[in-house]
């Protein structure tokens, strides 16, 4: 029997959290039962931070929210039946938000591990509903999350065009993201996050492992960083398509990118304004756009062609990293190549990737999954099936693409089964749907997106 037996653990504990204003280091402490403490640290540059009065209260609220949400990385190792919060208490609204993050954010993890989480995740409610958080007089400035891919770069350029002061922000030590961030020419904020080293040992000892809602964790980190820096906006770049999951026969919808979707954005953003700071806005600038609309926007500038990468193999915590920015075989590479193809010259796209992914017959299976042909949409941050089908149909009508192996196969085997009315590009370019973008800003960026 291994030293860590996930089936024998009864309680996951949120032991304590603290922030050292002199160093900017937040310490998040967890434990299973009476086992050793699991200590994670998050380091926000710019210390020392002067915290007093309402600002200190808001920072404490944000710190506890981060402690609760970041705990998902450790909770999943055993998924025990009980949860305890040792050093503070939470109200029903906080418990509901965090339970939702754990339940839906671990949806793919539960599906892959054959676990049933519904009704199993209960955060203890021991506090009365809190009074509404006050406005703090935060200065107008955006912390913009950058991930190294096309989406955040579209947001950064749209905010630049709209005249919004911004700081390009990321978490962790990715050199690829740093290169992209520096390419923007804007101020940067690189936040450090060090997971408890014991977590990797638990994984070796048979802990449950799998995908977590990392955007939820990063959102909580950036809310804390925004308060420490006294700024009023945290901006992500999640588009409309992120709200749609993979349809699994016998299971229903499982959304790999749930914390990039509208349900999370709405719940988290509303919570922050009610419980943390009334004038701190959390929103995704691209929410009203489809993946294809974002791709069209990105194609308007070649400023980042030699720097960006959406390839997930560059970003796995553990595992191989390709020498090139694009591995060419993962679902993200497949999708981004396909999404950009209708909107830029073929030579430019092939230059970016270093090869033509659509003229390689061995890639057909990967594209079938994107098209939802004989397979479900991959568990990746990729667009809806109809977006992929529409993009492929556009290429099928173009002389420069229609002889390429994957496109040719689409024309022969797949397109005849599809309704041409479902393959129109214009509806996918519509700017529509709910969002949390401040109204005055939305008027400015909407005009830019519509061109």
Curated annotation (Swiss-Prot):
* Cellular compartments per GO CC: cytoplasm
Q: Is Isomerase found in the keyword set?
A: yes
**Top-rank lineage group of the source organism:** Bacteria
Keyword annotations = Cell cycle, Cell division, Cell shape, Cell wall biogenesis/degradation, Isomerase, Peptidoglycan synthesis
Question: Which reaction does this chain catalyze?
Answer: UDP-N-acetyl-alpha-D-muramoyl-L-alanyl-L-glutamate + ATP + H2O = UDP-N-acetyl-alpha-D-muramoyl-L-alanyl-D-glutamate + AMP + diphosphate + H(+)
- Name one molecular function that GO assigns to this entry: racemase and epimerase activity, acting on amino acids and derivatives
EC identifiers of the protein: 5.1.1.23
Q: In which pathway does it act?
A: Cell wall biogenesis; peptidoglycan biosynthesis
For biological process, the GO terms are: cell division; cell wall organization; peptidoglycan biosynthetic process; regulation of cell shape
The UniProt record's further free-text remark is: The combined activity of MurD2 and MurL provides an alternative route for incorporating D-glutamate into peptidoglycan.
In terms of HAMAP family, this protein maps to:
MurL
Q: What family classification does the UniProt entry report for this protein?
A: Belongs to the MurL family.
Q: What does this protein do?
A: Cell wall formation. Catalyzes epimerization of the terminal L-glutamate in UDP-N-acetyl-alpha-D-muramoyl-L-alanyl-L-glutamate.
Would you tell me the protein name for this molecule? UDP-N-acetyl-alpha-D-muramoyl-L-alanyl-L-glutamate epimerase
Q: Which organism is it from?
A: Xanthomonas oryzae pv. oryzae (strain MAFF 311018)
The gene for this chain is murL
